[in-house]
Amino acid sequence: MKVPFSWLKELVDIDVTAQELEEKLFSCGFEVEELIPLDAGISKVVVGKIVEMEPQEGTHLTKCVVDCGSYGHDIRISTGASNMKLGDCVPAALDGSTLPGGIKIKARKMQGVESNGMLCSGEELGLNDDLFPGSEVYGLLILPEDSVPGTDIAPVVGLDDYIFDISITANRPDCQSVLGIAREVSAILGKPLHMPAMDYKAVCDADAPVSVKVEAPDLCPRYMAHYVRNIRMGESPRWMKRHLALCGLRSISNVVDITNHTLLEMGQPMHAFDLNKVAGRSITVRRAAEGEKITTLDEKEFTLNPNNLVICDAEKPVALAGIMGGANSGMDDATTSLLFECATFARDSVRKTSRALGQNSDSSARYEKGVDRHSPEMGLARALHLIQELDCGDITTLEYDLTDGRPLERRHIVTTPAKICGVLGITVPDQTMIDILERLEFTVDVQADGSWDVSAPLYREDVESFPDLAEEVIREYGYDHIVPTFLNTASVTNGGLNYDQKQQLKTKRLLAAQGFYEASTLAFYSNAEFDMLHIPADDEARKAIRILNPISENLSVMRTLLAPSMLNVIVDNLKKGNAEGRLFEMALVYLAKELPIQEHPHERQTLCLGAFGPAEDFFTVKGALEALAAGFDLTFTYQRETTSWLHPGISAAVYCNGKRLGVFGKLANEINAELEIAKEQKDSQNIYLGELDYEALMSCVEGGLRYKPLSPYAAVKRDLALVCDEAVACGDIEEAIKKASPLITEVKLFDIYRGANLGEGKKSMAFSLTLSDPAAEVSAEQVERTVKKVLGNLKFKLGIEIR
């Protein structure tokens, strides 16, 4: 939220610099994201008085002699402007000066005549008419006649100001206004707060009846309205235009500006209905009917439902409650009578409608954080005062104040100084705490028994109990008073990881050792992700739980697979120029027994692997899985399996102890062709994915450590190149080899070859066999017999020949 320093000074007698105030606000819990000087980028620009001027022969330029005070009384500057006259004061950017946007001004010749600077327009200084009148005139900015030559330009045109860009947390909706921040500044500096004037006087009766009613008090706890007739549209005064401009708004007309000014100053959103456009001169706050439509002030049409709160006339909706008015009831130059409204709407209702319709506004931003029930009264009073002050219309006696029946009263909290200090862990003098609370507009009534009856201001709905009071005390007293101390206990229990956390950490380290980096994605995506992976319509993975109020349609369902998220991460990396990489993610997937969901879904821990790059292949992921198996003393087996999102010939299912853990392989060609990446990337990239049920994997791990003595005898290795049919699976060959002899302790595939010399439908697979015996050295005869048995088994069971 943007808060001008000069506006704060109107409400509080500030005696510190903007930089000092920024530090004080931060120490009291307000993050100033940026302190913006209005004269940023401007240097060595001063008031210059034109003392001589003559046309520059043969050009459109005018040669001027400018009095710039202490910088020189006869500085010669040429300009292409024509709206100045002798004696005018104008902004002069001297040799070596800078202007907004990084523009540097240097002395140079213009059409053969030396010019020692530049005379500036308002726009060149970053000004507009709302900030300083005349800034948008084509030509030079003409300054007031009494401007002193040589004076820095910033204070002359109002650029000697700062904007505080403050991040307001959700628990402090009372600070969503200049007044809210001014209250805090008043308490911080111990200076009195000058409240904006809110007095007004009704000068006439209503010339026609107006009906106002609330049919949904649960969503609209308070609705206030006041009828103003004989509206006189016109320009706003300069001070109001400047206030709006400093906060980023343009002046429109006096009445519209009053509603915007009230929003910024008081934090109270308000709207004015043109009663000539309100059917039946009737206003009703109700839930929308199914299929009802409204076109808002920004000319967007929305179809509504009963979850949306609307303000209607006798025929149709005229505003989205708390968000934006309708185009069919807005003000224009022909407006003669207005109904000003201020209300409190349920924050959840505004937030859900705003998200569902994708419609946001300054009003909805405030209502979503919360507007207290006292705020409409103050906001409407301030607006009516301004209407009377600016003579915009005649205030009638017709007013409405409709509530949900709850009394409007201050919340009382009974506590003791000891309780507050107990929360803080330090001792703060009683009187100091009372002074702090009273500066923050709390009242403290000290009881006979020493307890305090503290009442919170009406606008502080966030203060509910004595820990909240402790927070108010310490942020004003200073967090630096809190001294770090050890816990008052005989022993301290060090934290640690439980078994599951240790296993997860071990898994991550094993994968990191294989060159994989951890990825972290959101737990939501859209149903379109299932289409991206060509997952069949009847697949269990499509039973995704839909979010009731998603941030966007792209994040509308809870994930049932990690693979779509991993593929999106890979595509994003490729788009950003990362041509290769290895990634893994360990996260939960959410599996519903039935839809719509009736009970809490099963949250299953899942592991996903992703590898991409021209050099990556099937064995990248398989090698990572083998490293994982070795790290947990497991043995994985692999079987051919078809999955919609993997290549049918370059993929496999992973098993351990007979349990299916998951699948891995190369991304299916048809999916790769549909990826939103460059064609050359599609042609050169190899993308591999794998997804495992991590819980099933961990169930195969035996608890405790087991030790096996190393064999004192050297192991023997033999390599076999085998020719088989394309249909023969690698896992079947490995299993047949291992069953041939107990001497075979390890089998590794290290090469696959296909060629015309092998014959059609044939492939060659090369395996490395490790033979060892812990009790004796393996002899050459044993090796020979084992190899013969292996080859015999392979030929008999799978029809495989040695190459």
Describe each PLM feature range.
Residues 39-43, 200-203, 455, 491-492, ...:
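Beta-rich nucleic-acid/ligand-interaction surfaces
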Residues 5, 23, 53-55, 189, ...:
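Glycine/proline-enriched, intrinsically flexible loops and inter-domain linkers
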Residues 33, 47-78, 246, 259-328:
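Conserved mixed alpha/beta core segments that line enzyme active sites in large multi-domain catalysts
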Residues 185, 189-214, 391-420:
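Terminal amphipathic helices with adjacent charged low-complexity linkers/tails
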Residues 114-130, 135-140, 154, 311-408, ...:
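Mobile "lid/hinge" segments at catalytic clefts and subdomain interfaces of large enzymes
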Residues 180, 413-579, 718, 770-777, ...:
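Extended, well-folded interaction surfaces typified by the phenylalanyl-tRNA synthetase beta subunit core
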Residues 1-202, 339, 358, 362, ...:
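Phosphate-backbone binding interfaces of nucleic-acid-interacting proteins
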Residues 2, 20, 27, 438-442, ...:
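A carboxyl-terminal module marker
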